């Protein structure tokens, strides 16, 4: 019986094993979930545009602001400066006036530099040119207008290639009217010739001479237009005696505070314009001590050697130095410390004087610089101790 039960049990086990494969359960891995990610965009930095300042253009002779670069030619006009030839006509409209000995030991003349001669109706009185003017013409690339000259002076100008002409010569007058005579002020014949600015420029143009030129004229101007040297000595009156051997000639510059300019005084009187009555006054005054010689007739200057001198503006004066690189370069001016001289916006008088010429000046601080600090009218100054005592005082007592 036990054997039957055992067989039955074995049989049952075999039958259960043949009933099919047991199910295998696969645990499916969950599908990967892709989370969409936003693309990271680096913030775009816009380039910072720094506004560029518009360029500022200046007149190279007077520092005035222009709308465009100055590319014109400068004109130099020869003007008499002897006592019998006063008063001048429109000399003060020149951007730069240079005074110097020119010949025969004691003859002084001026070379007036104009950046816009066309706008000047009359200029004079006009005298003949001299070799020393040829030097300056070469330094500044000038077109020179004059009343003729000696064979020496004219031949020298021609040999250097200087563009120049006699405003009264017939061949010039046939092209355009460049001059007129005026004896109204009892002038002698040689002192009655005057140039016409528009005619002078028109004649220069008719000759095919270059009327545009970009170059350095040596002058530097303060950005704010104020060229007063803060450290300068007070100089209400500046006196220069041009001196060469026995020859003497006095020039005085007197500061006019209302005008803010130096008024030219010579021959014992204040210089005024014949037509307008305007004072001949200058914003800047430069005194150039120069090595000058005389060959028996004409004066000559060694400009390339440079030198020392003085600069005045706004009632103050300082010592300066000046240089000139070569025969074709303009004069350049520096302070004693070697910094470029920054001039005031306006016209300039330049004296080119021999080394033995004395220069003096006198002046004092203007009234507004000597007054004490202003106080409120009618109020006395109160000390800190008095103020503290007043604060502690009972209202009845205070008031």
List where the protein language model places each region.
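Short, linear, compositionally biased motifs with a strong N-terminal bias
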Residues: 10-11, 387
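Positively charged n-region of N-terminal signal peptides that target proteins for export
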Residues: 1-9
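C-terminal motif of bacterial Sec signal peptides marking the signal peptidase cleavage site
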Residues: 14-17
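A surface/extracellular/periplasmic glyco- and lipid-processing/surface-interacting theme
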Residues: 50-98, 104-380, 398
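Long, low-complexity, intrinsically disordered segments
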Residues: 380-399
């Amino acid at each position: 019986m036990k054997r039957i039960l055992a067989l039955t049990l074995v049989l049952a086990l075999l039958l259960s094993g043949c009933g099919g494969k047991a199910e295998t359960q696969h645990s499916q891995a969950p599908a990967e979930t892709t989370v969409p990610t936003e693309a990271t965009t680096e913030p775009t930095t816009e380039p910072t545009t720094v506004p560029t300042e518009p360029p500022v253009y200046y007149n190279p002779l007077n520092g005035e602001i222009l709308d465009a670069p100055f590319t014109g030619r400068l004109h130099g006009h020869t003007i008499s400066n002897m006592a019998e030839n006063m008063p001048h006509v429109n000399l003060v409209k020149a951007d730069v006036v240079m005074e110097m000995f020119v010949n025969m030991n004691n003859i002084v003349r001026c070379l007036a530099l104009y950046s816009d001669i066309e706008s000047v109706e009359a200029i004079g009185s006009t005298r003949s040119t001299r070799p020393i003017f040829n030097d300056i013409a070469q330094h500044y690339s000038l077109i020179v207008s004059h009343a003729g000259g000696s064979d020496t002076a004219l031949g020298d100008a021609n040999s250097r290639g200087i563009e120049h002409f006699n405003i009264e010569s017939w061949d010039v007058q046939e092209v355009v009217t460049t001059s007129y005579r005026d004896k109204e002020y009892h002038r002698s014949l040689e002192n009655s010739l005057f140039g016409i600015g528009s005619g002078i420029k028109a004649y220069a143009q008719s000759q095919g001479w270059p009327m545009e030129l970009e170059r350095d004229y040596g002058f530097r101007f303060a950005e704010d237009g104020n060229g007063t040297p803060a450290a300068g000595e007070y100089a209400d009156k500046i006196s220069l005696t041009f001196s060469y051997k026995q020859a003497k000639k006095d020039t005085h510059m007197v500061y006019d505070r209302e005008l803010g300019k130096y008024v030219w005084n010579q021959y014992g009187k204040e210089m005024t314009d014949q037509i307008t009555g305007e004072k001949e006054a200058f914003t800047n005054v430069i005194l150039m001590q120069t090595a000058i010689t005389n060959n028996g007739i004409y004066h000559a200057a060694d400009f390339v050697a440079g030198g020392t001198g003085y600069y005045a503006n706004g009632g103050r004066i300082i010592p300066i130095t000046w240089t000139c690189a070569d025969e074709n370069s303009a004069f350049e001016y520096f302070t004693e410390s070697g910094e470029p001289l920054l001039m005031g916006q306006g016209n300039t008088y330049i004296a080119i004087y021999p080394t033995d010429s004395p220069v003096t000046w006198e002046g004092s601080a203007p009234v507004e610089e000597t007054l004490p600090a202003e106080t409120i009218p009618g109020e006395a100054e109160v000390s800190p101790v008095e103020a503290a005592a007043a604060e502690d005082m009972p209202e009845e007592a205070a008031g």
